[in-house]
UniProtKB/Swiss-Prot annotation:
Is synthesized initially as an inactive proenzyme. Formation of the active enzyme involves a self-maturation process in which the active site pyruvoyl group is generated from an internal serine residue via an autocatalytic post-translational modification. Two non-identical subunits are generated from the proenzyme in this reaction, and the pyruvate is formed at the N-terminus of the alpha chain, which is derived from the carboxyl end of the proenzyme. The modification Pyruvic acid (Ser) is found at residue 252. It comes from Shewanella baltica (strain OS155 / ATCC BAA-1091). GO terms for cellular component: plasma membrane. PANTHER family: PHOSPHATIDYLSERINE DECARBOXYLASE (PTHR10067), PHOSPHATIDYLSERINE DECARBOXYLASE PROENZYME, MITOCHONDRIAL (PTHR10067:SF6). This is Phosphatidylserine decarboxylase proenzyme. Heterodimer of a large membrane-associated beta subunit and a small pyruvoyl-containing alpha subunit. Its main location: membrane. GO terms for molecular function: phosphatidylserine decarboxylase activity.
Length: 292
């Protein structure tokens, strides 16, 4: 059965399907929208008591429901200056060192950090010898993405690609999955060096949004697009630890890359398949003064 599911991933018209689902998810269809939301809540056992608006009828579109806000304080933020926090609700797929520009995906599968970053060689060099973490957001999860540490945006890259599903099954079976799918790469400058937040698209993921650019929708094609941003002055975009930086419409995966020596150790319990909750401790940081 798994082989059949993987074969279907290669055969499906994934971009066409995603565009169709995107239009349906954005539609404001009244009772039909509410019925779809209620079905989704039941199917995926979503705890709506955490949502700022707990009633399905409050959402005019499925996208509005899927990108719902949480109640204030429902995800307490670890404010320890030596702690990096989880950026999302989800589950750790893999994490570990970046060795010779290679990132571990699953048993028997690695992919290139250079390819992941859209063949931006100078960017890839900045993360050599550092660490990575891949976090999968399931349909039931809260789908806003937050900053694990304070950072100032320096660059965004849109990389066109496939739209394979990014669930654990495809991660185990599709080579180079996260470096093949459509993605948005945001690079931030932090006290501990560069941080890359890679938002990976997937089948039926209608769109990827960032708080500074809105929905990232370059023209259809195979061209990589880059935007550079000032890191100083009134136009600099600085986001605090825990602040929202983006969101998925219909969910996917976040891959984070960290500079060499930025992380001392991952926090207790942070390992492959561990459940993550935004705001909780993710990693212990090297002391900034020592790093300098």
């Amino acid at each position: 059965m798994d082989k059949v599911k993987i074969a279907l991933q290669y055969m499906l018209p994934k971009h066409l399907l995603s565009r169709l689902v995107g239009k349906l998810a954005a539609a404001e269809a009244g009772a039909l929208t509410t019925a779809a939301i209620k079905w989704f809540i039941k199917q995926y056992k979503i705890d709506m008591s955490e949502a700022a608006q707990s009633e399905p009828e409050a959402y005019k579109s499925f996208n509005a429901f899927f990108t719902r806000a949480l109640k204030p304080g429902i995800r307490p933020l670890d404010m320890d200056a030596d702690i990096m926090v989880h950026p999302v609700d989800g589950a750790v797929s893999q994490l570990g060192p970046i060795k010779n520009g290679r990132i571990f995906q699953a048993k028997g599968h690695h992919y290139s950090s250079l390819t992941l970053l859209g063949d931006q060689a100078e960017d890839a060099k900045r993360f050599e010898g550092g660490d990575f973490a891949t976090i999968y957001l399931a349909p039931k999860d809260y789908h806003r993405i937050h900053m694990p540490i304070k950072g100032t945006l320096s660059k965004m890259t849109y990389v066109p690609g496939e739209l394979f599903s990014v669930n654990p099954l495809t991660a185990r079976n599709v080579p180079g999955l996260f470096a093949r799918n459509e993605r948005v790469v945001a690079i931030f400058e932090t006290e501990l060096g560069p941080l890359a937040m890679v938002l990976v698209g997937a089948t039926i993921v209608a769109s990827i949004e960032t708080v500074w650019a809105g929905t990232v929708t370059p023209p259809t094609g195979k061209q990589v697009f880059t935007w550079e941003y000032p890191t100083q002055g009134p136009d600099a975009i600085t986001l605090d630890k825990g602040e929202e930086m983006g969101r998925f419409k219909l969910g996917s995966t976040v891959v984070m890359l960290f500079a060499k020596d930025a992380i001392a150790t991952f926090a207790e319990g942070v390992e492959a398949e561990a459940v993550t909750r935004m705001g909780q401790a993710f990693a212990n940081l090297k002391d900034v003064k020592q790093a300098d």
